[in-house]
Swiss-Prot record:
Post-translational modification: One or more lysine residues are methylated.
Native species: Natranaerobius thermophilus (strain ATCC BAA-1301 / DSM 18059 / JW/NM-WN-LF)
HAMAP family, A to Z: Ribosomal_uL11
TM stretches of this protein: none
Protein name as annotated: Large ribosomal subunit protein uL11
Gene3D superfamilies from the UniProt entry: Ribosomal protein L11, C-terminal domain, Ribosomal protein L11/L12, N-terminal domain
A Pfam family per the record: Ribosomal_L11_N
GO molecular function: large ribosomal subunit rRNA binding; structural constituent of ribosome
Amino acid sequence: MAKKVAQVIKLQIPAGKATPAPPVGPALGQHGVNIMSFCKEFNEQTANQEGMLIPVEITVYEDRSFTFITKTPPAAVLLKKAAGIDKASGEPNKNKVATVGKDKVKEIAELKMQDMNASDLDAAMKMVEGTARSMGIIVEG
């Protein structure tokens, strides 16, 4: 018989840097999950993606066991890395902070394709371009 799901927790944690400190500790602690075992497993699984913010979906079962699925980094994080900026524009319609080429947008769209609600690469690229526009990043090409 399948285990009963008690809760699904969604967090964004830096790759390889999960610690029992907030936000991880309190989110898992209130559901009785072994925080250290989650941190250890997450850090092992994301060690190769150092410096990225990784969304994770943790499924907690009634017997306090858990499973988790890591997703691809948010498009905004990937765009900031591609553009070489630390912070997006506070006023994207007035202040443009960087430019990225269509080739970079395509790379990001291909990487994000599995987590996106898009039927083809063109649709995924349009989503990434929209994210770039809302961040004050100009897409060239």
